[in-house]
């Protein structure tokens, strides 16, 4: 029974994406004057693997584009073509077009014909120039396709040494045996086919290169499942006799001549990752999300049982209570293990910036050195995909407005090469991402003047950090002219809003003439939260534990009134704004006298304030439920959760609460 090869499309798409990313990184690292042989080989192998897979799935345009690039790379690694910056740029452009072609195939669309013809002509022209010819290589697409098909056949032909190739595939899944037989049949005529429950062996009648076979099969199985042996041609009777007595054997017991060519073909790329690749599998994100949801329900159930067990007599039910404690520990360990599946390294984000910085710095006429720190730091997949756009905007802003032109840096006594640092590290239950440049820094006077002209409430006594945060106001920009890079005043406010929607906040530190650091703090995950539950009248609210500094009983002498009905609480010489939770959410029956309640000191976006509640309940894990998708967006509330007794509690948006409280008071005063 035959299986549709389209079942393996996604495997090819995923691996091709990884190969293209590797190709770009190696191209960026190449020194044209003295290219590293290993890097050139890695780029060549990536192109060769993509070409083989594209041919298998019938992605002709991608196959032909990759084939032309592969030929040029082969000339470069054999020293027949001298690399330079223009050639590297052309290879990078080819990689971009290959990515566009791959994306088109993902969407079941045909790639753009114009870009295909353009890049093929450019590559063929380069090939002619490398051979000392200057005739333009303008070739019609149809003719190009035919030519490449002929070249592909020619390059796979081995010397006619009257030998055939026998392939042995082992450790196969049941549904792979027929599929692989079909695919091998597409490459050559098969004879002496022997199929087992988990193995397949066959002789290929035709001139097919071993590395081309490996390139195709490795999109379905691993390289160490493939082995080859040469079968010397003989009269029919002898050949038949040989086939009959040759048992199907796994690669481990094949004679030395049957040594797996797959290992030779992939040696440079696979050696460092052999252990990782042999112990990893691809799992759809939807399945991981479903598993996380089930673990979330388990946490809720465990919380319900824990609440019930607290009502039991510890003398009569000691063993049950002990077992409940063990269940709680196991549930937490399970939750942490499952959550780690969704964690991805920041390298996924950082890897796209070397190319961006290189291209944009060249466009702006600046020299910039990019340093990446903490690429292995992990973050939840849902957040890592959403952080790309904000970080991209910050990097572009640093390049355009932060780092000066070379002549200005020389005048300021700086190195002409500017420094841009992207870093990531864990801080408690958060991840801290920083974008740092050693450019001109923020101009305090210009920012204040611009803010005043826009009618913003500012004064000369504001700290440098407070002045810096003004650039995140909607429509705010001090750029003297608008460019296609930045300066339109739309972006920094969107960056801040996007970060806040992810449950994080953004801070800025800048010193004029020395540079700027923009810091982003995000929770590691949005699925499960460590929180402190508090009560206001009959309502329960959850405060994110990483925002809680301390709690205390306020005294009358520490409370001080301000204009507009506001009050501040003095805590060890520091005056903190007092936010009364019952007023913000209009909760009836709450304790209105501050001295009768409890104050929780919270910190968000570098600012501290005091939150008045009736009672502290305790600390525990809660499963975050999206409130907006199930109800509607509520100001001051970030999400909801289900408590152990089955009731719903709201999770407070700590960063928005103080501003919401101020807006309500201003509205009351204006009325």
Swiss-Prot record:
**Which superkingdom is the protein from?**
Bacteria
What is one process in the GO biological process aspect for this record? chemotaxis
Description of how the protein assembles with itself and partners: Trimer or tetramer.
Q: What is this protein called?
A: Chemotaxis protein CheA
Could you give a GO molecular-function term held by this entry?
phosphorelay sensor kinase activity
* Keywords carried by this UniProt record: ATP-binding, Chemotaxis, Cytoplasm, Kinase, Nucleotide-binding, Phosphoprotein, Transferase, Two-component regulatory system
Coarsely, its chief localization is: cytoplasm
Under the heading NCBIfam families, the entry gives: PRK10547.1
Task performed by this protein: Involved in the transmission of sensory signals from the chemoreceptors to the flagellar motors. CheA is autophosphorylated; it can transfer its phosphate group to either CheB or CheY.
What EC number(s) has UniProt assigned to this enzyme? 2.7.13.3
What reactions does this protein catalyze? ATP + protein L-histidine = ADP + protein N-phospho-L-histidine
Gene Ontology terms: cellular component: cytoplasm
Q: Which InterPro entries match?
A: Bact_Chemotaxis_CheA, CheA-like_dim, CheA-like_homodim_sf, CheW-like_dom_sf, CheW-lke_dom, CheY-binding, CheY-binding_CheA, HATPase_C_sf
Notes on the domains? May have three functional domains: one for interaction with CheB and CheY, a second for regulating phosphorylation and controlling the stability of the protein, and a third for receiving input signals regulating CheA activity.
Domain HPt, first and last residues per copy: 1-105
Q: What class of enzyme is it?
A: transferase
Which is one Pfam family of this protein?
Answer: HATPase_c
Compartments, record wording? Cytoplasm
| UniProt domain Histidine kinase: residue ranges | 274-526
| Composition bias, Basic and acidic residues | 261-278
Annotated region (Disordered) at 256-278
- Chain ranges of the CheW-like domain: 528-663
Phosphohistidine PTM positions read: 48
């Amino acid at each position: 029974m035959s299986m549709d090869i389209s079942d393996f499309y996604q495997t090819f798409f995923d691996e091709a994406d990884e190969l293209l990313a590797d190709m770009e990184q190696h191209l960026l690292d190449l020194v044209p004057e003295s290219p590293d042989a290993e890097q050139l080989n890695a780029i060549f192998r990536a192109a060769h693997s993509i070409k083989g897979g594209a041919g298998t799935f019938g992605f002709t345009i991608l196959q032909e584009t990759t084939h032309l690039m592969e030929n040029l790379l082969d000339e470069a690694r054999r020293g027949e073509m001298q690399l330079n910056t223009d050639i590297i740029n052309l290879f990078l452009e080819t990689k971009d077009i290959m990515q566009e072609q791959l994306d088109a195939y993902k969407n079941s669309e045909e790639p753009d014909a114009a870009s295909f013809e353009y890049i093929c002509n450019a590559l063929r022209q380069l090939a002619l120039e490398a051979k000392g010819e200057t005739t333009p290589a303008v070739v019609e697409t149809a003719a190009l396709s035919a030519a490449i098909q002929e070249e592909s056949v020619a390059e796979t032909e081995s010397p006619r040494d009257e030998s055939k190739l026998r392939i042995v595939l082992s450790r196969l899944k049941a549904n792979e045996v027929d599929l692989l037989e079909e695919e091998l049949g597409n490459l050559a005529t098969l004879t002496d086919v022997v199929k087992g429950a988990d193995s397949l062996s066959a002789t290929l009648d035709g001139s097919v290169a071993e590395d081309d076979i490996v390139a195709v099969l490795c999109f379905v199985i691993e390289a160490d499942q493939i082995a080859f042996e040469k079968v010397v041609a003989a009269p029919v009777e002898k050949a038949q006799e040989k086939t009959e007595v040759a048992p199907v054997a796994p690669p481990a017991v094949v004679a030395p001549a049957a040594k797996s060519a797959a290992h030779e073909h992939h040696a440079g790329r696979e050696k460092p990752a052999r252990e990782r690749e042999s112990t990893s599998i691809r799992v759809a994100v939807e399945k991981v999300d479903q598993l996380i949801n089930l673990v979330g329900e388990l946490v809720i159930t465990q919380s319900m049982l824990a609440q019930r067990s607290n009502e039991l007599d510890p003398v009569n039910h000691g063993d049950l209570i002990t077992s409940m404690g063990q269940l709680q520990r196991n549930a937490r360990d399970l939750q942490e293990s499952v959550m780690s599946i969704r964690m991805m390294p920041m390298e996924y984000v950082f890897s796209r910036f070397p190319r961006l910085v290189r291209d944009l710095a060249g466009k702006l006429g600046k020299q910039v050195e990019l340093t990446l720190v903490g690429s292995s730091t992990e973050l939840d997949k849902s957040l890592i995909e959403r952080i790309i756009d904000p970080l991209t905007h910050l990097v572009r802003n640093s390049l355009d407005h932060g780092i000066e032109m070379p002549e200005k840096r020389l005048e300021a006594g700086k190195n002409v090469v500017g420094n841009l640092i992207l870093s990531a590290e864990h801080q408690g239950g958060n991840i801290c991402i920083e974008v740092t440049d050693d450019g001109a820094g923020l101009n305090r006077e210009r920012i204040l003047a611009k803010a005043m002209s826009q009618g913003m409430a500012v004064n000369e006594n504001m700290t440098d950090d407070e002045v810096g945060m003004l650039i995140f106001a909607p429509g705010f920009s001090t750029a003297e002219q608008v460019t296609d890079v930045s300066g339109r005043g739309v972006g920094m406010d969107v960056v801040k809003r996007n970060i806040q929607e992810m449950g994080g906040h953004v801070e800025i530190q800048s010193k004029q003439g020395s540079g700027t650091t923009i810091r982003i703090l995000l929770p590691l995950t949005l699925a499960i939260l460590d929180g402190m539950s508090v009560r206001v009248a009959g309502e329960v609210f959850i405060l994110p534990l990483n925002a809680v500094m301390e709690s205390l009983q306020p005294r009358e002498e520490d409370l001080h009134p301000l204009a507009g009905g506001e009050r501040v609480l003095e805590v060890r010489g520091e005056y903190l704004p007092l936010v009364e939770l019952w007023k913000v959410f209009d909760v009836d029956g709450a304790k209105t006298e501050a001295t009768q309640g409890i104050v929780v000191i919270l910190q968000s976006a570098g600012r501290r304030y005091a939150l008045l509640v009736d009672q502290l309940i305790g600390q525990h894990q809660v499963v975050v439920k999206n409130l907006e998708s199930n109800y509607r967006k509520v100001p001051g509330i970030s999400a909801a959760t289900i408590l152990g007794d089955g009731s719903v509690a709201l999770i407070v948006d700590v960063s928005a609460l103080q501003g919401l409280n101020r807006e309500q008071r201003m509205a009351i005063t204006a009325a």
